């Protein structure tokens, strides 16, 4: 009662009562008394509110009972009440009962300061009927009080109505209310012509109106939507029809999918461009580092790995070609290299062949040295014997020459003596001449033989014995003949001999 008093008189209540009044959101009397505060002309006829306070209290109790009976009464859950039309029908039924309460209450013609004619014109008469004429008294009361359409603009009423079971018994997800025009002169039900939809769950309370929860859960949900997805339009509480909202959602989804596809295509194109640029950069680097491709028969390993420059690869190629030519020459020289494939095996064959050649050379050098030693020894002996024999023969010839000279001189002396004594010594001279001649012949023959080969001792003795035997016989014959011959013939024979 105190709260109603302060609300009707428009005086500010004490702070204790103000806080208590702010926390009383479940009582419908506080909501109804709040209508007086929204009066555009509060200072006009304030005494009228004092006079009507008792009547308002009675009507408040009747309104509470009617509202509780309406809430407790079951409603058929058919298809008519499942959409936005069901919500409008429910609100119209509620306001119609309130109008009946005003008509039955001693025919006062007012609902909380509202004239009977206004409530009847709103809900008792058809919607298409023209508005009845109003007098100045009812026009003043209409300006003084707040119309019934404040149900839709009051956020507290929406929150309290969401707690009742009748509003939560049916599914209102994704459904919106249609506009509800009410003929009241030239005025509509609301300035915007829309009625708010009440949701039963706390998650759907945020969808009632942007005025109730500005920047609340809905804004957070909007922020949590990732990029690239379609931007869904916020669900309006007063869209014309559910089909319109569904088509809008479909269009939004298509637009969002198209936008996401366009963004995805742009990203893919950018990634492909980046990959192409990277591939071109890598290709340029590889082209700069790698030398030109060698012929098929020659493969340069370092050039293929990219470890050598162009000049280095060319020098390496020339060097390897020279090595290959030398290896071919070795293959031709070494008999076993042609049958072997592979550089390692070729090198093994070459090494084995060279070692065998070294052994052969050593063996041949040793054999040659042994043969040369034997020949040198034989030649030395032969040369020494020749050197010894030549001077001996020279000495013998010199001695023979001297002997011949002496013999000739002695022979001349004998001839002189013979001439003097020709008769005494005829046989001696002849014998001397015969002895000298075979000796000279023997010496010449032996000297000639000494140049060819060295005579043996037995041969020399045999020749000497033969010479002695020959000389004795000759001497006897000569002596016998010389005695019988003529001395002139002897002298001639000696001259011929000499």
Curated annotation (Swiss-Prot):
It comes from the Eukaryota. GO terms for cellular component: nucleus. Signal peptide: none annotated. SMART domains: HLH. Homodimer. Binds reversibly to CRY2 after blue light illumination. InterPro entries: bHLH_dom (IPR011598), bHLH_ZIP_TF (IPR024097), HLH_DNA-bd_sf (IPR036638). It is found in: Nucleus. The keyword Coiled coil does not apply. Residues 1-24, 207-297 are annotated as: Disordered. GO terms for biological process: regulation of DNA-templated transcription; response to blue light. Residues 259-270 have a biased composition (Basic and acidic residues). Transcription factor that binds DNA to G box 5'-CACGTG-3' and to E-box 5'-CANNTG-3'. Binds to chromatin DNA of the FT gene and promotes its expression, and thus triggers flowering in response to blue light. Residues 307-357 form the bHLH domain. Residues 271-281 have a biased composition (Acidic residues). Residues 233-246 have a biased composition (Polar residues). Keywords: DNA-binding, Nucleus, Transcription, Transcription regulation. This is Transcription factor bHLH78. GO terms for molecular function: DNA binding; DNA-binding transcription factor activity; protein dimerization activity. It holds the Pfam family HLH. The keyword Transcription applies. CDD domains: bHLH_AtBPE_like. Transmembrane segments: none annotated. Expressed constitutively in roots, leaves, stems, and flowers. PANTHER family: STEROL REGULATORY ELEMENT-BINDING PROTEIN, TRANSCRIPTION FACTOR BHLH78. It comes from Arabidopsis thaliana (Mouse-ear cress).
């Amino acid at each position: 009662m105190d709260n109603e008093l302060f609300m009707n008189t428009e005086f500010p209540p004490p702070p204790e009562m103000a806080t208590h009044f702010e926390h009383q959101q479940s009582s419908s009397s506080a909501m109804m008394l709040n209508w007086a505060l929204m009066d555009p002309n509060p200072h006009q006829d304030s005494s009228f509110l004092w006079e009507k306070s008792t009547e308002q209290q009675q009507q408040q109790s009747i309104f509470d009972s009617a509202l509780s009976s309406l809430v407790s009464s079951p409603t058929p859950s058919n298809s008519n009440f499942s959409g936005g039309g069901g919500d409008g029908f429910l609100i119209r039924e509620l306001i119609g009962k309130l109008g009946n309460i005003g008509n039955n209450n001693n025919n006062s013609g007012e609902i909380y300061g509202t004239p009977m004619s206004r409530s009847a014109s709103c809900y008792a008469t058809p919607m298409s009927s023209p508005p009845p004429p109003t007098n100045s008294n009812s026009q003043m009361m209409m300006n003084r009080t707040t119309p019934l359409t404040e149900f839709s603009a009051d956020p507290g009423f929406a929150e309290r109505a969401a707690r009742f079971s009748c509003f939560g018994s049916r599914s209102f997800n994704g459904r919106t209310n249609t506009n509800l025009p009410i003929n009241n002169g030239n005025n509509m039900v609301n300035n915007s012509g829309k009625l708010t939809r009440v949701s039963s769950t706390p998650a759907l309370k945020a969808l009632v109106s942007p005025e109730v929860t500005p920047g609340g859960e809905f804004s957070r949900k909007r922020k949590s939507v990732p990029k690239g997805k379609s931007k869904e339009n916020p669900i309006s509480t007063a869209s014309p029809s559910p089909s319109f909202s569904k088509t809008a959602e479909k269009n939004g989804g298509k637009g969002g999918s198209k936008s996401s596809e366009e963004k995805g295509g742009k990203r893919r194109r950018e990634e492909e461009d980046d990959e192409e640029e990277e591939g071109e950069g890598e290709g340029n680097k590889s082209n700069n580092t790698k030398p030109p491709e060698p012929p098929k028969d020659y493969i340069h390993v370092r050039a293929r790995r990219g470890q050598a420059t162009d000049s280095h690869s060319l020098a390496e190629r020339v060097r390897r070609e020279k090595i290959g030519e030398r290896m071919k020459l070795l293959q031709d020289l070494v008999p076993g290299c042609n049958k072997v494939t592979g550089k390692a095996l070729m090198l093994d064959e070459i090494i084995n062949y060279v070692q065998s050649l070294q052994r052969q050379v050593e063996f041949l050098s040793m054999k040659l040295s042994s043969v040369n030693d034997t020949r040198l020894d034989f030649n030395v002996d032969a040369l020494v014997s020749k050197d010894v024999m030549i001077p001996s023969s020279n000495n013998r010839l010199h001695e023979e020459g001297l002997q011949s000279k002496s013999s000739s001189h002695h022979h001349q002396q004998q001839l002189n003596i013979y001439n003097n004594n020709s008769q005494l010594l005829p046989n001696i001279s002849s014998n001397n001449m015969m002895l000298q001649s075979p000796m000279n012949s023997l010496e010449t023959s032996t000297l000639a033989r000494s140049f060819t080969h060295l005579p043996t001792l037995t041969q020399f003795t045999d020749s000497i014995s033969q010479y002695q035997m020959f000389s004795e016989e000759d001497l006897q014959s000569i002596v016998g003949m010389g005695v019988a011959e003529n001395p002139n013939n002897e002298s001639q024979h000696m001259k011929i001999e000499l």
